[in-house]
Each structure stands twice: as C-alpha cells, then as structure tokens.
C-alpha cells in the first residue's frame, strides 16, 4: 500500500510540473504574439493605434523607432517558435545595444545643433517635442534620438561638448561591431587597413592595364599606317597634318595672344584716358567670410493650435461650398509660418469665378480678418484659399540660409527672402532678376527685407567680388553699413547728392561697356574670363570687375528733390546695366505713379510687394491686386522676372543686433577703401550778391503771391524767358522756392511776414 501511495504522489508531481510548463509556454506564446502584433501595427502605422505605437517608439528612440518595432517583431517570433525567453544580455546583443546607443547619441547631437540650437535645454526641449508628437502623431516630424538619445547626449554634451559627444558615439558603434562580429578592435582596424591597401593596388593595376591597352592601340594604328603604300602616305599625311595643326592647344593659345597683343596696348592706353575708380585689384586671401553661426538661431513656435483649427476650417469650407451649391472638396492643406493654404478642387462644370466671388462669405464662415484666393494655383488643378494663422511663426535669416536647397558658393548674389506657404526656403539670384523693386506701406517689413538682402550678400561675397552703393535719404536705415569694405563710397544721405551718385554709377557702366568693346567680350563674365587668361600669361596683372549692387532705400524722397535726374539715371541703369554686372534694388514707401513711373516699372521686372492700403497701390507695384490682403510684418508677394503670378512669402527676420554683429565681423576682416571717383561731390554753397537788379523785386513778388513761375515773372516785369528762368533758378539755389515738380507749381519756402501784410 505504501508503495502504491508513493507512485500516485509521484505521478501527481510530474503532472503538475507538465501543467506548469504548458502554462509557461502558453504565456510566452501569447506574449510573443502580442509583441509581433505591436511591431507590425506600429511599423505599418495602421490607424490611430498604429500611429500611437509608432509615436510611443519615437518617444524612446526617435529616428530608430523602426529598429525598435522590428526588434519587437523578432523577439516575439523567437518566443513563439522557441517557446522560451532569449538571453537578453548575451555578448552579441550587448554589441547591438551599444551600436543603437551610439547611433542615438550621434542622431540627437545632430538634432540639437540643427533644430534646437546649441544653447537649448536638451532634455526639456526634447520632452516637449516628444509629448506633442505623442498626442499629434506625424505632425511634429523629426525628434532626433528620442528621450534615450536626449538623456545620453545631455550628459556627454555637458561634459565633453559637441566633438567629444560625436567621438563617444563613434567609439560605441565601433566597440558594438566588435562584439557582434567577434573581431577585436585591433583586428577591426587592421582589416580596414588591408581593405584600403587592396583598393589602392587594384587602382594601380587598373591604370597599368589601361596604359598597356593604350600602347597596343597606338601600335596597331602605327602598323596600319605602315601597311599603306608610300605614295598614298605622302598624299594623305600632308593634308592631315595641315588639318590637325590649328587645334593644338599650345599653338592656338599663342596665336590668340599674338592677335590680341596690340588690342591690349589699346586697352591700357584707353584705361589711362578713362577716369576709372581705383578698386581693389586683387583678392584679399586673408579675408574670411562671416559664418552663418554669427546670426541668431530661430525660436521654436508652438503651432499646435493651428493643427486643431485646420480640421475645423476644412469642414467649414466644405459646408460653405455646399450651402451655395458649389461642388468642391479640400484636397490638401499647407501650414505655413503666417498663413495656412487650403487647396480646393472644384468638380467638373464648376466655374472658378463662382468660388472667387464667395471670398467674403468664406471669410465670414471662417471668422477670418481677411482671406486671399489664388485662382488657380499655377501648375495645379486647384484653387488656393489662404487664411491667416492665429500665431505667426517667426522665420529667421539663419534658418533660411542653413536650409537653402540650392546652395552654390559661386553664386555671389544669391539672396535669402524667407519661407513660402509650404515652408520651403525661398532664395533668389539677383543677377538673374536683374533689378528689384521693393514697395509697401510703412512698418510692413521693407527695411528688414533690405537688411536681409545686404546681409545675405555679405555672408557670400568678398569685397573684391561684390561692391555696393547705398543711398539712404532717411539717414537711419543703412548708416550702420558705413565702413564695410564692400562700399564704393560712404552711404549717401543727402538727396541732392543721390542723383550725383547715380550718375557716377552710370559713368562706371559706360566705362565697363568701353572695356567690353575693346576686348571683344559681351558681358562682365566674359570680360573676367578674358582677364584670367591674360593674368595667367602675363606678369602685369589686370583686376577683374566686381558686381555692383545699387541700393536706394527711399525713392519717393529722391523723386521729390531731383525727379528728372534720378529717373533718367535709374532708367539708363535698368536698361543697360545687367550685362555690366550692375544691379538695382529700389525700395519705396509710397507706391504712387509719380514715384514708380511707367518707365521705371518697365525696366525693373522683378518686384516685391509688402502690405499696402488699397488694391490701386497693389496694381502700381505688381500690375495686379493681392498686396492689400497681406498681413504685414514681413508678409510679402514676390513676382520674379518671367513669372505670371506672385509667390507669397513670410520674410526672414533679422534684428539690428545681428546686423551689427555681421558688420563688425566684416570690418574686423578688412577696412573700407572708398573710391574717390565714386564719392559724390560736395554741393557748392551760393555766395556773393545777385547781379540782376530785379532779383529782390522778384523775390518780393513770389513771396507775396505764394507762387513762382517763369511766365509770371515775364508778365509782371516784361522781361524775356531766359532772364525770368535765371531768376527762378537763382531763387531755387538760395532756397526761396522748391524744385520743379512737373505740372505742379513750385513750392514757396518763404512765408509772407505780418508787417508786409
């Protein structure tokens, strides 16, 4: 009996053990299936749950969320197939962990430098972005290496700075590869050295084989020529030699130099006769361009409210269209820095004009201050409805320059403007524009735009490559640039001297065209190429021509003082200066036809319009409406040459402190060397008595009548036209009357005294 009881108790124990094993394996299978499901749903981002899993993975490992979810699938598969937990801290797995940690550290270091800024709090800034991404998946975007990357980087960056952090990341990756592959670090580097030697020897063998093949080909050609009969050799070779002689490079270049030698003598003689300004002849090799880091990084603006508003507005738009019987749907939405653009695709048979006519109703439905409708969007079968954001995201000049998709260092006149509605960095090449008109109401962002253009050029071009002439009648906007080596002359602030400065630029343009005609070149680029060839072959070096950018900050004031001289100079420069490498940037507050005349508009094809008060002003600038609906504070419409419709841009902001930093950096590199011939002459003061005995009587008459004209003096004093005109000119020089203003009467600057009355 005792033996039977022992047997039954042993069976019970074995059965309970097997049951425990079965339940444990069952739990492992369930866990494995759950891990596989989480990984697959997260990787494919299936629905709200999938996006949530993916965002949760991004929260921990950022850009490597795919690796984490793939690891979840692999771990789950192992648990289902093997029905046991893997050893999570084996040698190879530890190596994989180290590789992942190294990549997370490197990725988050890159994220800090390019997105958060070097001075940002790493953990707190990342935590904010991660939380926002968790609750709004696929809307925040790149979050670096997640919280794990942020935790490691915050420690290493504090202790070892940027270079040390990157070094730690590389060492972690190398050691991880060593653990995974089972190769020691010494063997790892020796393998790399062997591979480099192998590539070097392969390349050497390939070049030797190439030489052998070429030698065999030459030998075959020589054999073919020998096989030909002697009579044919003489007949064929002589013409061949005659034909092949000219294309030889050495003979051709020497022939060119022989032909152009007398021309150079003429040029040097002509240059002695011309009054040319003494520019910097050659490159200053010590000069270094200012780094982009000198500008302040962009501040991150929270636009989370805008995402919520987009869905609400899209629904309101579709309901509004439906209530007016218009069949249309919202196909795409672009959230920009200051404006959100809704792309509306109308159904077949719906007129575009019908949607445009609903602009007031759409503004009412969206409770928007104002909306702008782009109908249709160029290159798309859709209509754009632009609605202002609740919070405007600031666009800094630094972020536009850093995210430039077409960054070419050779383009010295590439300027940064801002970001368009889709968030793309907007750049423009001034040499292709080739002249630019900037207009808008006061406080709309013109001066910041001009400062951004000048700073963009200073960051790209050295003083011998680009020169500038600045005219600032307001005396406060451009004075900060006095002393930079790029200036041809100090900033011109006297409106009367401004016309003279423009005339000197016209004279420089004519001098350049004279040089082109004597060298047989067509433009500045061709002339500079010619000078480079000349300098390579001659000891006497000739200077290359720099670009010249003429910046006029307030055209309206100049047109009031000397409209005829200013308009003539601007017209001549706009018509002819492009090939000479001279480009105009003209800014004005008052976009009226008296200031922006038809002749000026016809010759300045590229325009930038800031916010204006009426559609008439918008038509004066752009020849179309739209600028009256802009928001101000840098909101602009760019109409480049060759474009039929303008592009809406949020202008890049540049503070006064940033401008001063760039100017101080440039001046520290090189001092200004002004050209005496380009500095406007001092306006001589009128001295001495007037010889005409009628002058004082004429002044009394003009002051009494409070009007001045040549015909009035002719009638009152019974004198000829020439004498009356001289009297008026004398009064203008002495400040009694103002300048000639077209059909308007001259302004009398002296009031009638009470005693005279």
UniProtKB/Swiss-Prot annotation:
Gene3D superfamilies from the UniProt entry: 3.30.980.40, P-loop containing nucleotide triphosphate hydrolases, Winged helix-like DNA-binding domain superfamily/Winged helix DNA-binding domain
Membrane topology summary: Multi-pass membrane protein
One BP term from GO: chromosome segregation
GO-annotated cellular components: plasma membrane
Main location: membrane
Annotated compartments: Cell membrane
Function: Essential cell division protein that coordinates cell division and chromosome segregation. The N-terminus is involved in assembly of the cell-division machinery. The C-terminus functions as a DNA motor that moves dsDNA in an ATP-dependent manner towards the dif recombination site, which is located within the replication terminus region. Required for activation of the Xer recombinase, allowing activation of chromosome unlinking by recombination.
Region spans: Disordered: 1-20, 735-757
Spans through the membrane: 30-50, 61-81, 93-113, 140-160, 163-183
Assigned keywords, A-Z: ATP-binding, Cell cycle, Cell division, Cell membrane, Chromosome partition, DNA-binding, Membrane, Nucleotide-binding, Transmembrane, Transmembrane helix
UniProt keyword GTP-binding present: no
Cytoplasmic side stretches: 184-757
Entry protein name: DNA translocase FtsK
Residue ranges occupied by any FtsK domain in the UniProt entry: 423-619
UniProt-listed Pfam families: FtsK_alpha (PF17854), FtsK_gamma (PF09397), FtsK_SpoIIIE (PF01580)
């Amino acid at each position: 009996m005792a033996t039977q009881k022992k047997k039954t108790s042993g069976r019970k124990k074995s059965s309970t053990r097997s049951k425990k094993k079965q339940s444990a394996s069952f739990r492992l299978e369930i866990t494995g299936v759950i891990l596989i499901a989480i990984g697959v749903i997260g990787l494919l981002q299936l629905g709200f749950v999938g996006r949530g899993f993916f965002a949760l993975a991004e929260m921990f490992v950022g850009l490597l969320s795919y690796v984490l979810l793939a690891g979840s699938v692999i771990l789950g598969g192992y648990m289902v197939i093997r029905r046991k937990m893997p050893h999570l801290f084996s040698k190879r797995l530890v190596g994989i962990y180290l590789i992942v940690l190294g990549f997370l550290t490197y990725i988050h270091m890159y994220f800090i430098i390019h997105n958060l800024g070097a001075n940002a709090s790493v953990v707190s800034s990342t935590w904010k972005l991660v939380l926002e991404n968790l609750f709004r998946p696929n809307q925040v975007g790149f979050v670096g290496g997640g919280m794990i990357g942020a935790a490691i980087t915050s420690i290493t960056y504090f202790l070892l700075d940027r270079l040390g952090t990157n070094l730690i990341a590389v060492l972690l990756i190398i050691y991880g590869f060593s653990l995974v592959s089972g190769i020691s670090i010494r063997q790892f580097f020796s393998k790399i050295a062997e591979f480099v030697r192998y590539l070097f020897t392969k390349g050497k063998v390939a070049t030797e084989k190439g030489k052998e093949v070429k030698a065999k080909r030459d030998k075959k050609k020589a054999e073919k020529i020998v096989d030909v009969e002697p009579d044919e050799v003489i007949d064929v070779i002589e013409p061949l030699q005659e034909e092949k002689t000219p294309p030889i490079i050495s003979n051709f270049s020497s022939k060119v130099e022989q032909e152009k030698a007398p021309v150079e003598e003429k040029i040097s003689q002509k240059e002695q006769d011309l009054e040319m300004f003494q520019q910097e002849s050659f490159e200053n090799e010590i000069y270094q361009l200012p780094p982009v880091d000198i500008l302040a990084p962009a501040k991150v603006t929270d636009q989370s409210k805008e995402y919520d508003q987009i869905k609400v507005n899209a629904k309101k738009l579709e309901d509004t269209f439906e209530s007016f019987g218009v069949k249309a749907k919202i196909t795409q939405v672009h959230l920009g820095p200051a404006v959100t653009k809704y792309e509306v695709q109308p159904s077949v048979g719906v007129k575009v004009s019908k949607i445009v006519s609903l602009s007031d109703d759409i503004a009412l439905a969206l409770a928007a201050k104002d909306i702008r409708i782009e109908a249709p969007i160029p290159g798309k079968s859709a209509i754009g409805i632009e609605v202002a954001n609740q919070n405007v995201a600031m666009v800094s000049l630094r972020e536009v320059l850093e995210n430039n998709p077409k960054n070419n260092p050779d383009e010295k006149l590439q300027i940064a403007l801002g970001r368009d509605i889709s968030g793309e960095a907007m750049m423009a090449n001034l040499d292709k524009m080739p002249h630019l008109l900037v207009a808008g109401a006061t406080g709309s962002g013109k001066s910041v735009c001009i400062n951004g253009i000048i700073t963009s050029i200073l960051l790209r071009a050295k003083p011998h490559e680009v020169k500038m002439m600045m005219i600032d009648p307001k005396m406060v906007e451009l004075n900060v640039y006095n002393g930079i080596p790029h200036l041809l002359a100090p900033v011109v602030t006297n409106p009367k001297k401004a016309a003279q400065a423009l005339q000197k630029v016209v004279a420089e343009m004519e001098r350049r065209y004279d040089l082109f005609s004597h060298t047989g070149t067509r433009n500045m680029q061709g002339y500079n190429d010619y000078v480079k060839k000349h300098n390579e072959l001659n000891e006497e070096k000739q200077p290359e021509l720099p670009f010249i950018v003429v910046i006029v900050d307030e055209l309206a004031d100049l047109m009031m003082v000397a409209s005829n001289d200013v308009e003539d100079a601007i017209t001549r420069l706009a018509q002819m200066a492009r090939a000479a490498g001279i480009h105009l940037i003209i800014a004005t507050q008052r976009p009226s036809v008296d200031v922006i005349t038809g002749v000026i508009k016809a010759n300045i094809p590229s325009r930038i319009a800031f916010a204006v008060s009426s559609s008439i002003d918008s038509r004066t600038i752009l020849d179309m409406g739209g600028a009256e609906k802009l928001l101000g504070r840098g909101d602009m419409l760019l109409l480049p040459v060759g474009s039929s419709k303008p592009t809406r841009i949020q202008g890049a902001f540049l503070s006064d402190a940033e401008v001063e930093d760039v100017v101080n950096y440039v001046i520290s590199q090189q001092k200004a060397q002004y050209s005496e011939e380009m500095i406007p002459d001092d306006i001589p003061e009128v001295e001495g008595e007037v010889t005409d005995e009628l002058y004082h009587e004429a002044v009394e008459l003009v002051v009494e009548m409070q009007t001045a004209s040549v015909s009035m003096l002719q009638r009152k004093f019974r004198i000829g036209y020439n004498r009356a005109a001289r009297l008026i000119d004398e009064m203008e020089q002495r400040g009694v009357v103002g300048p000639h203003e077209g059909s308007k009467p001259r302004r009398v600057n002296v009031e009638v005294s009470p005693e005279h009355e």
